[in-house]
Swiss-Prot record:
Transcriptional activity at macrophage-specific genes is inhibited by interaction with GFI1, which results in the inhibition of SPI1-induced macrophage differentiation of myeloid progenitor cells, but not that of the granulocyte lineage. Changing residue 45 to A: No effect on transcriptional activation of CSF1R or FCER1A promoter. It comes from Rattus norvegicus. GO terms for molecular function: chromatin binding; cis-regulatory region sequence-specific DNA binding; DNA binding; DNA-binding transcription activator activity; DNA-binding transcription activator activity, RNA polymerase II-specific; DNA-binding transcription factor activity; DNA-binding transcription factor activity, RNA polymerase II-specific; DNA-binding transcription factor binding. Pfam families: Ets. The modification Phosphoserine is found at residues 141, 147. Residues 154-164 have a biased composition (Low complexity). Pioneer transcription factor, which controls hematopoietic cell fate by decompacting stem cell heterochromatin and allowing other transcription factors to enter otherwise inaccessible genomic sites. Once in open chromatin, can directly control gene expression by binding genetic regulatory elements and can also more broadly influence transcription by recruiting transcription factors, such as interferon regulatory factors (IRFs), to otherwise inaccessible genomic regions. Transcriptionally activates genes important for myeloid and lymphoid lineages, such as CSF1R or FCER1A. GO terms for cellular component: chromatin; nucleoplasm; nucleus; transcription regulator complex. Residues 171-254 bind DNA. This is Transcription factor PU.1.
Length: 271
């Protein structure tokens, strides 16, 4: 068979002999035995031999250097690494900050464009703007404060002339006081000084009771004070319905208010 393989031209590799296999196994067993003999031996002897070898080589090479020299070399390495990391972080931050310029530029362009959005809207007329300001003032003002925009501009009906509580229609403060003066209600708190001129005066003792009555008329949850009611009367001085007289706690209605009040009084049914 061997000759036939040679004649056909195929390379021939002889199979391993039994002696070679036996030799390798014996070598492996011998090396394994030597390895375990080293492990199972006395560990102290090997440890002593190791430290003797290390001590011999270290002191022979570096015995000329002082001891503190090695400590300084070990303490210098970490700061050098930290400086390297910080330098790398600064470079990364510089690279990241560079592309942020275009978004800021576009943002400033958007802000500059914002006022143009309001231009197409038509401006409010003076009358409409004044009405919006009055409504906004009522929403922002405290609930107890009497504002000048509390009236709806309608002529008060007969049910409002005597300050009836719970009415759905609004009544202004000057009309409320005029109704009290003409009806004689709460005459201990307010009275005429000169009816023809429209001058009236509050009582220094009972003015708070009248203010409380006005708070109930408005539907306020908290108690109305004379100070807030007098503030509303001073606001009427700007529009002309009521003006302050130099005398203490004394005010005067305008002729227009007295005329409207006389017309409403004539509309009342006879008792």
């Amino acid at each position: 068979m061997l000759q036939a393989c040679k004649m056909e031209g195929f390379p021939l590799v002889a199979p391993p002999s039994d002696e070679l296999v036996t030799y390798e196994s014996e070598l492996y067993q011998r090396q394994t035995h030597d390895y375990y003999s080293l492990i199972g031996g006395d560990g102290d002897s090997h440890s002593d031999h190791y430290w003797d070898f290390s001590t011999h080589h270290v002191h022979s090479e570096f015995e000329s250097f002082p001891e503190n020299h090695f400590t300084e070399l070990q303490s210098v390495q970490p700061p050098q690494l930290q400086q390297l990391y910080r330098h790398m972080e600064l470079e990364q931050m510089h690279v990241l900050d560079t592309p942020m310029a275009p978004p800021h530029a576009s943002l400033s362009h958007q802000v500059s464009y914002m006022p143009r959005v309001c231009f197409p809207y038509p401006p409010l007329s003076p009358a409409h703007q004044q009405s919006s300001d009055e409504e906004e003032g009522e929403r922002q003002s405290p609930p107890l404060e009497v504002s000048d925009g509390e009236a709806d501009g309608l002529e008060p009906g007969p049910g409002l002339l005597h300050g009836e509580t719970g009415s759905k229609k609004k009544i202004r403060l000057y009309q409320f006081l005029l109704d009290l003066l003409r009806s004689g209600d709460m005459k201990d708190s307010i009275w005429w000084v000169d009816k023809d001129k429209g001058t009236f005066q509050f009582s220094s003792k009972h003015k708070e009771a009248l203010a409380h009555r006005w708070g109930i008329q408005k539907g306020n949850r908290k108690k109305m004070t004379y100070q807030k009611m007098a503030r509303a009367l001073r606001n009427y001085g700007k529009t002309g319905e009521v003006k302050k007289v130099k005398k203490k706690l004394t005010y005067q209605f305008s002729g227009e208010v007295l005329g409207r009040g006389g017309l409403a009084e004539r509309r009342l049914p006879p008792h």
